[in-house]
UniProtKB/Swiss-Prot annotation:
GO cellular component terms attached to this protein's record: cell division site; plasma membrane
Protein name as it appears in the record: Cell division protein ZipA
Keyword tags: Cell cycle, Cell division, Cell inner membrane, Cell membrane, Membrane, Transmembrane, Transmembrane helix
Transmembrane segments: 7-27
Subunit: Interacts with FtsZ via their C-terminal domains.
Any one GO BP annotation for this protein: division septum assembly
Periplasmic side stretches: 1-6
Family statement drawn from the similarity comment of this UniProt entry: Belongs to the ZipA family.
Lineage: Bacteria, Pseudomonadati, Pseudomonadota, Gammaproteobacteria, Enterobacterales
Membrane topology annotation: Single-pass type I membrane protein
Source organism of the structure: Shigella sonnei (strain Ss046)
Domain of life: Bacteria
Length: 328
């Protein structure tokens, strides 16, 4: 892609250079042709001036009346030449100075009128102002032929080089995020946890208090601290508590007189680490929950109050092992 862009820029620069050269040659040839066209006019004009000069010389040697007639005719011709075309480059000094001293001798005082018009032929002295004009166009086409030619050649590759620069650092940081999952392996181990199960009635129903009380007592729970039931190491209530049972409804307490009591469910929980073997205590806790659910017609749920599954039971066992390893 970048090679194609570079080739296009080179072709465009070459076309621009060729166009500038053709334009320079065309302008120079046009100005030369205009100069050649003006030369025949200048030659004809110079011939006319020479003829007028010869006539002036002949008039100076002739009669005064003829000279007066020629003087009046000469300024009109000079004004026409100045308005139509630039005057010739030849500068002639009219020989009127030699003719002026003869005027008071040959002519009467009335012939002194022509000297008032005689200074008009001196106007061709201002004509040299037009002489440098045809020479100036010859120097103008020289500058555009040389100066603009190297500019597109050097400026074309610069944007192409700048376009490559931002593309290189983009690919460098891509492989870096691959090494980030390493800190995940260093999770701190749990030193304590709480395993929770629920025994709940079916949707739209509640557990009967009298049936619930009989099933709790058959599972080995005894009413005790915090007004909840506890399962101790011994069925008679002696020894440390292994796990406990509370009401699912806040504040979670029970009334020993449960004949008229109803509840949507109960919660069984065990704190790890606990007395004895935590995995054996977990199995006893699961058996107690299944016994109560069978007696009251409920179901066993996990800590999220979802149906208990074998995967969730293995997750509980993994948590217990992790806590045991952390406290070993």
């Amino acid at each position: 892609m970048m090679q194609d862009l570079r080739l296009i820029l080179i072709i465009v620069g070459a076309i621009a250079i060729i166009a500038l050269l053709v334009h320079g040659f065309w302008t120079s040839r046009k100005e030369r042709s205009s100069m050649f066209r003006d030369r025949p006019l200048k030659r004809m004009k110079s011939k006319r001036d020479d003829d007028s000069y010869d006539e002036d010389v002949e008039d100076d040697e002739g009669v005064g009346e003829v000279r007066v007639h020629r003087v009046n005719h000469a300024p009109a011709n000079a004004q026409e030449h100045e308005a139509a075309r630039p005057s010739p480059q030849h500068q002639y000094q009219p020989p009127y100075a030699s003719a002026q001293p003869r005027q008071p001798i040959q002519q009467p005082p009335e012939a002194q009128v022509p000297p008032q018009h005689a200074p008009r032929p001196a106007q061709p002295m201002q004509q040299p102002a037009y002489q440098p004009q045809p020479e100036q166009p010859l120097q103008q086409p020289v500058s555009p032929q040389v100066a603009p030619a190297p500019q597109p050649v050097h400026s074309a590759p610069q944007p192409a080089q700048q376009a490559f620069q931002p593309a290189e650092p983009v690919a460098a940081p891509q492989p870096e995020p691959v090494a980030e999952p390493a800190p995940v392996m260093d999770k701190p181990k749990r030193k304590e946890a709480v395993i929770i199960m629920n025994v709940a009635a079916h949707h739209g129903s509640e557990l009967n208090g009298e049936l619930l009380l009989n099933s709790i007592q058959q599972a080995g729970f005894i009413f005790g601290d915090m007004n909840i039931y506890h399962r101790h190491l011994s069925p008679d209530g002696s020894g440390p508590a292994l796990f406990s049972l509370a009401n699912m409804v806040k504040p979670g307490t029970f009334d020993p007189e449960m004949k008229d009591f109803t509840t949507p469910g109960v919660t069984i929980f065990m704190q790890v680490p606990s007395y004895g073997d935590e995995l054996q205590n977990f199995k006893l806790m699961l058996q107690s929950a299944q016994h109560i659910a069978d007696e009251v017609g409920g179901v066993v749920l996990d800590d999220q109050r979802r149906m208990m599954t074998p995967q969730k039971l293995r997750e509980y066992q993994d948590i217990i092992r992790e806590v045991k390893d952390a406290n070993a």
